[in-house]
Every structure is written in structure tokens, then in C-alpha cells.
Amino acid sequence: MKFPKNLFLVLFYTSWKFCDVCAYTPSHPLVYTKYGSVIGSVEYSRNSRAYMSFKGIPFAKPPVGDLRFKAPEPPEPWNFSINGTKDAPFCIQKNYFFSNPKVEGSEDCLYLNVYVPKTEGSQLLPVMVFIHWGGFFAGRGSSDYIGPEYIMDKDVILVTFNYRLGVFGFLSTLDDNAPGNFGLKDQVMALKFVHENIECFGGDNNRVTIFGQSAGSGSVNLHLISPASRGLFQQAISQSGAALDLWARPLNALQPNVTAALAAFTGCSAHIGSSKDIVDCLRKIEATKLAETADNFKYFSIEPLTPYSMVTEKQTDANPNPFLVQDPLESLKAGAFMKIPWMVGSVQDEGILRAAPLIRQPETLQTLNSNFEKLITQMLFLQFSAGANASSLLKNMTDFYLGGKSLIDVNNPKSVQGFINLYGDRAFHYGIYQTVILQLRKGHKPIWMYNFNYKGQYSYGDKFAATDKNVNFTWGVSHCDDLLYLFKSPGLFANLQKDNDILMSKTMVSFWTNFAIYGNPDPHQNLNWNSLNFEKPEGVKVADLNIMHITGNHETGKIAFDVEKSQILDRIAFWAKQSLLENFPDFG
């Protein structure tokens, strides 16, 4: 098998002069980037299509030593061929989402993978860049979690990458000593690398679609807003996360306390009062020890998922390219964001992310029910939204979702589902709808919306539960379950086996790659999935939105694709009626 030479263009006389030679051998293709050459391998897609795999390409200098807690810097050129046949280390983390978490990964982790399908033509291919999930404290872009085999059946190039997490990615002293948002700035650096180098791989840097799930989804939306990301992509897909979800909002006021606590945990508290001295001290702490400090912040179960957050930054000589200069809500209200083709959606039961472990772990459930009001107030950031009225908001929530009871009754399916809905709406659905409405009102089009409610053989909910124990309840479609059909994940799940699961996977891949190729998930209108288009968008309401509902399961023959109104209008209306700081007029 040979790849046609026109996959790799020789660009001696263009602005891409660094692509001086692009050569290959039948089994180990070689590509020259701006910084040096990479030897890849030839692999095969689900449908046995050959594709080239280039893994472990550095897109920034290792963020270690003096570069810890600093914005990423471009990689140093290399004068040898990088072995791109295996994944590079993922970013150091402790993944509390899964059972028996331990510190793993490396601080030297800013690497990306590029996957290029075999094609017969000479035209540059559209590019899809995936931003991984993980709550900004876990996750990876490596092929054991984000495998390319399904997408490589289509005529697109796929790029995956790592970015700094937890304390390494999001510590902030709110000044030039550690301005913060380093993980998001890593994402920008990866996009810059793609912009500068993807043509060497046969990709079109004017047809780049960024897409992400959960934390990656919120990141995608923030890239629409950030001035640092301008011009680096042309389309976007957000899966289960948006800029107005609370976990994607900057929380500057909390960070001084977080930094002070971290200093105490690491023996750096003598330097309190001098952010420079604190950061200098923290740079000397061994990476594993620093990662372990996340344990010290936990007050219940794995809460908080992470104490670190996005922050707004000031542009200074020492911080010339801040990622966020104001709260995303203010940017959206001002219409200060990229109005490019955007596909956005969620899964039916987002709340399983935390409901599964809280309910399926008996001791955890007992603790939660014994201290329900206090713990739920903390977990769902009620004081952030309602201030002194948090207790009133809590009562309204329990009345609406839990039948007026301040506990989860595992013997009552309505109670279990009610808690799933409560967590999912608070953490995901409401912020997504807020974001879409506000962006529509500011003239953003085209936008496509979807809701994913297909129940397959496997579920991330079983991973998040972190136990084999269960309750008598039929669990629905969990947060992250859509990923099962876009990416092979051999580090987490066996191969898809059920006919319907495989069919769903091929359909989802078609939607996503159609969007990347044509700017439309349903370009031939086979399913009448139209973008949201309003003559007077300034008055649009949630009830006006037409959403693609994807439903079915692996046990029956029917998979359905229906464009309908939202199925959770009553739940969105509930939150819109509450006195929340993040609410804005005439929403609902």
C-alpha cells in the first residue's frame, strides 16, 4: 500500500517555506514541520481504510522548572526525526472521576497527535481539533481514550492534544506572577501549531473545526470569546458544556484563598503576602506532591472536583496575551465573540456524572442524605448564584426536583431521576441554553442544536460510579456517553459490538464530519435538521428552539432522529424564575 505523494505538498514557493520536504516510506511516513521532522506509522480505520498516524509531536516547550505556572512558549526546533509512533505522556493528574485514583502522567505533556486518512485527490483536507474532557483536572488526548479509528473513515484530518490540568493549568495569583488560565493558553498554543503546520500534513488551515466535550466543550465556547484565539479556527462544536455553565465561569474572588491553602499544604505559607515568593516556592515542589494536594481540598466524596477555576486577567507587558479579559457573560451580552458556524448540544442525563457515584456508593449516599442541605448547597454553588437567598433556592429546588424531600430516596425512581435532572440542569443544561439564547440574540448564526438520548451497551456512568454496587434503577444516557460513538477508547471500553451501537457510531461520525466538511451536519437535508434562524433573534426564547433529538437503544431496532422543541422547557423555566446572579432579563 502506498500513499499518494500529493497528500503531502511540497511548498517551496509559498508562505509555508518550512515544509521544505515531505517524504514517506510505505510503513513509516515522514513529515517536516516548522520545527523539525516526525516519523509516523500507517494504521487502519474501522472500515480498513489506511491512515497515517503522527503521535507525540511537541507543540510547546515542556512547562517545567521556571516555565511552571507560565504561559506556554513555542517548542524548540529539533534536528532529528521524532518517533511519532506512540503516544507521549499525558498531563499529570489525579483522575477522581474513576475508582482508585492515583497521580499519573507527566508535567512534560504538551504534545499533540495528527491523524491523516488516505485520499486519492490533491485537495487539502478539512481539520478537526478535539479538546478533551475531564473537568479541567483530568483527561487526555492520547489514543487509548480518544482513538481516531472511526473518524478516519472520513475525509478529514483529526488532531488531539493534551493541556495542563489542575494546579498546573489553573493556579492563579491574579497578577503577573501567575496570571492563570494556563491550560486554556495551552489549547491556544496547540491551535497555533495547527495553524502553522497542518498544511505539511495535507490539512487546510482555513477549514479548522474545533470540538470538545464537557470541559473541552466549555473550552470551545470560551475560544469563541477569547481574543487570544482569533483566526485560529472557522467552525466549532460544543458537546455538553458552554461558557455560561458555572464551572466555566471565572471565579477570581476564590483564588486568593485557594492559593493560600495550597501554600500551607506545601510548606510555602511563610511566603504569604508575596505572590512572587509563593510561586517561586511552589515551582520547587515536586510535581507528584503538588498534584496530591488536591486531596486536601476535598470536603465530601470528590467535591470540589477542582478548587481551581478560570480567571479574568489584565493585559500587561508580562502578560501580553490574556485568555479572558472579562466575564464571559459580559462578553456575550456585548456580542464580543466569533459568530461562526456552531453545533451545540447535550446528552439526556448529564447529571449521571455525579449522581452515579453519590447514589451507587452506599456510604457516600448515607453521608449525603445525612447532610443534604449543607452538601448540596456547596456542591451546586448555590451561594455563588443566590447569596443570602441560597436557603430559599435550595427549598425551591427540593420542592421541584425531589418532591419536597431533602434526600435521595433510592427506592423511589422519581427521586433518583429527580436528582439526576437537578445536577444535570444546574451543571450543564441551563448554562447551555442561556449561552445559546444570548448568542442568538446577538446575531450568532448559523447554530445547530441537538440532544443525545441513545442508550448503548456501554456507559461512562458505570465508570463514574467507581463501584460495582447498584440500586434498582434504570440508568439513562450519561455525561460523556456520546463520546463512545465518535472515538474508539480501548483504555476504557471494549469494541462496540451491538449492531445499533455501530450504526449510531457511524451516524454520529457522519454528523460531525459533515459539519467539518460542509459546515452543516445535515448538508443534504435528509433529516430536516436546520440551523436556528430567526428574523428577529433579539426576542428569541427557549421555546422557539428546534432541536435534533437523537434517541434509541442497543436492544431494539429503532433509532430515531426527530427535530422537535426542547423536552425540558419546564426545568429551564424553573431556573429562569429563580433570583440568580447569572440570570439575565426575559430569558426562558
UniProtKB/Swiss-Prot annotation:
It catalyses: juvenile hormone III + H2O = juvenile hormone III carboxylate + methanol + H(+). It is found in: Secreted. Its main location: secreted. The active site is at S214 (acyl-ester intermediate), E350 (charge relay system), H479 (charge relay system). It comes from the Eukaryota. One of its GO terms (molecular function) is juvenile-hormone esterase activity. Glycans are attached at N79, N83, N257, N389, N396, N472. GO terms for cellular component: extracellular region. Keywords: Disulfide bond, Glycoprotein, Hydrolase, Secreted, Serine esterase, Signal. Residues 1-23 form the signal peptide. Inhibited by 3-octylthio-1,1,1-trifluoro-2-propanone (OTFP), a specific inhibitor of juvenile hormone esterase (JHE), but not by diisopropyl fluorophosphate (DFP), a serine enzyme inhibitor. Pfam families: COesterase (PF00135). InterPro entries: AB_hydrolase_fold, CarbesteraseB, Carboxylesterase_B_AS, Carboxylesterase_B_CS, Type-B_Carboxylest/Lipase. Disulfide bonds join C91-C109, C268-C281. SUPFAM superfamilies: alpha/beta-Hydrolases. PROSITE patterns: CARBOXYLESTERASE_B_1, CARBOXYLESTERASE_B_2. Its EC number is 3.1.1.59. Belongs to the type-B carboxylesterase/lipase family. May function as a juvenile hormone (JH)-specific degradation enzyme in vivo decreasing JH activity. Hydrolyzes JH III in vitro. Hydrolyzes effectively also methyl hepthylthioacetothioate (HEPTAT), a synthetic substrate. Of the general esterase substrates, it has preference for 2-naphthyl acetate (2-NA) and shows a weak activity for 1-NA and 4-nitrophenylacetate (4-NPA). This is Juvenile hormone esterase. It comes from Tribolium castaneum (Red flour beetle). The gene is Tcjhe.
